[in-house]
């Protein structure tokens, strides 16, 4: 059955462009909405409409696009971007299917594609018991297809997308990035942190190994990014500082007195928060001196396999 697909914003890669071309090859109609110059850069060869008005006009604009092109399906990456939230709701009201991509719930080698929403808006059951029951029936080694995707490749695409965005003030003057920080600030943070990691990487690996192979029982708390959409939109925490305090209060009250906890930074953190200072302050306030260890990097596999437990907040490490 022939369908008409509308593509909204995708990842900062050629993925949506290639998916659109594949659907077109199968005989489906393809259209796209450009919200910024980066969308144009990664939407070459796809018929598109530009949205460069204020957000209050988006629903009317989309409804016109739906009608003009007979849209039956809408494809997007993430359901919490400002331009996606009203689009998802409007499509639902009009009987248009939403197909929402997201970073994989399981990594590597997995991506997530769900109908109508992801994460907290997923149609999957919210009852933990369901996952215990279904998980027990799944194969231990599900079939996966290995693929190569280096950090450098992804970084090049990300930079290209945001370099194109330099034209936004001219072409899309009302566009607001969905990320919590600007690309230049993010890139500067990466450079600073990666430079720092060059000098401490081996030391951190040694520390992680010592903890993992030591006699003291320990737990691991892998941090998430402060800019993570699920933290900002679907959690009780405004940032990782609040999470750290919440977990350490519980650890001080309930964990065995001989146990330790390792707090490991996210590999893509840009260094906005001084976690060492935050954790040191919590150690004093909650009487945890010597039981809390902070790692910038290193040894996740060894730590995870030797830990008594892992405390997660929207982390694939769990």
Task: Pin down the residues of each PLM region.
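Conserved catalytic-core segment of nucleotide-activated headgroup transferases in glycan assembly
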Residues: 26, 172-276
């Amino acid at each position: 059955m022939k369908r008409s697909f509308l593509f909204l914003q995708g990842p900062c890669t050629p993925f949506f462009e290639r998916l659109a071309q594949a659907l077109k090859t199968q005989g489906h109609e393809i259209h796209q909405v450009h919200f910024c110059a980066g969308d144009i850069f990664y939407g070459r060869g796809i018929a598109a409409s530009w949205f460069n008005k204020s957000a209050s006009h988006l629903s009317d604009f989309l409804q016109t696009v739906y009608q003009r092109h007979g849209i039956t399906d809408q494809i997007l990456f993430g359901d919490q971007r400002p331009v996606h939230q009203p689009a998802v709701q409007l499509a639902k009201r009009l009987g248009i299917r939403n197909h929402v991509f997201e970073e994989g719930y399981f990594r590597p080698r997995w991506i997530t594609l769900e109908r109508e929403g992801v994460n907290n808006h997923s149609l999957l059951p919210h009852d933990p018991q369901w996952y215990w029951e279904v998980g027990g029936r799944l194969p231990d080694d599900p079939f996966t297809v290995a693929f190569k995707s280096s950090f450098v490749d992804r970084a090049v695409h990300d930079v290209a997308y945001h370099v194109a965005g330099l034209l936004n003030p001219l072409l899309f003057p009302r566009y607001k990035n969905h990320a919590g920080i600007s690309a230049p600030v993010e890139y500067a943070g990466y450079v600073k942190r990666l430079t720092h990691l060059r000098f401490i990487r081996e030391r951190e690996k040694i520390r992680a190994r010592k903890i993992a192979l030591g006699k003291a029982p320990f737990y691991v708390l892998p941090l998430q990014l402060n800019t993570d959409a699920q933290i900002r939109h679907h959690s009780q925490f405004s940032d990782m500082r609040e999470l750290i305090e919440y977990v350490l209060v519980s650890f001080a009250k309930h964990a065995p007195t001989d146990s330790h906890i390792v707090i490991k930074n996210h590999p893509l953190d840009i260094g906005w928060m001084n976690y060492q200072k935050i954790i040191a302050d919590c150690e004093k306030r909650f009487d945890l001196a010597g039981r809390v260890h902070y790692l910038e990097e290193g040894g996740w596999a060894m730590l995870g396999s030797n830990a008594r437990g892992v405390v997660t907040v929207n982390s694939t490490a769990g």
